[in-house]
Amino acid sequence: MNYVRIFLILWCAALPDALAGTEPLLYETQSFTLDNESTPVRVPKGYTLEWLVDMDRPRMLTFAPNGDLFAGSKSGEVYRLPPPYNKAEVLIDLSGYPHSVAFREGEILIARTNGLYRAPYQPGQTKVSRKEVTLLARLPGGFGHNTRTVGVGPDGRIYVSLGIQRNCTDQYLGEGYDFDDQRGGVMVLREGNGRPTWEPYASGLRNPVGFDWHPQTGVLYATNNGPDHLGFDQPPECFSKLTAGSFHGMPWFQFDGQQVNRDDCESDKPPRPIAEVTIPVVTFPARNAPLGMAFVPKGAMDEKLEFDAVVALHGSWGKPVGGGVETRRAPKLVAVRFKDGEAVRVDDLVSGFQLLDGDRWARPADVAFGPDGALYFS
């Protein structure tokens, strides 16, 4: 039996391969028990949600080549979880919000708000000394959307995503902007000729927390959090295809689900015209706060979900005018379904984290697939 384990602060879910041949997904409601309290959760039929381990405000999840699981955190710890992933060890305690980590041969990369850092690392190593951590490349820092997500692409290069400070801030990854205002997209690190430097890869993304490469096509996709100033229903949240030089419009332009419009909340002249805006491939309802994402690798979950993307929707803090907390967008995991290498629709995967009275017992932040084919989330 194959299992998918899902973390939630962190929790684990075991998912047997019982969905072959079903399209769309079939669901069932199960009783999930946490701290001696039971709550109903909706999962794909045949799948089971389990709790795994507690950590202090874990965020982005990364599996090392040897199968160890790592988690950055808002609390400052970088956690290491060796199989079976039910015990979290502190690899290193750092200031500066170590939101995410990545690996390349002989070293661990740690993305903090103000810079990308590295340290020597060998598989199975249980501790990293602060003295070993050195700055690889400075990042635009400052307040507001201060997470930094790092990943190593299929091309071996290092990519980092970062958001603009507010709903509408004149910040852009490109020429004409000071270094600290080069925010709102994905950058790639140029190495090999002297000091490493950042190059813009994709711009016009307000807060692209999660990104991953499609396993078949090698194309980069990212989630993106839209602004809050246009009400509860606009603009929709984005799941976008990124290409070298692509411009996604924010904060000067917003996609309303049908067309791209000028957003007058930012009066400064846009760095690029509206005709160059790349629209998202699929959207989620506004205020859902999509964060981490990962593509389903071959052999994980059900074969009908292979090469689809799983996205963590964190849920909204805002609510409709006159509505109570029970009307907020509910946290959940969703699957972006792909056909012939292109995104076609969004299906729920796991829901039930928000109760009928609006109380929440979990808000997914990131997702990652383990070497066991299991799906983990924080």
Each language-model region and where it sits:
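Beta-propeller domain segments
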Residues: 21-44, 147, 164-176, 181-184, ...
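Surface loop/turn motifs at the tips and blade-to-blade linkers of beta-strand repeat domains
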Residues: 50-56, 90-95, 135-142, 199-204, ...
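Structural WD40 beta-propeller signal
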Residues: 55, 64, 104, 151-155, ...
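Blade-loop segments of beta-propeller domains
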Residues: 59, 78-107
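Asp-box/WD-like beta-propeller blade repeats and closely related beta-sheet repeat scaffolds
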Residues: 97-98, 114-153, 161, 202
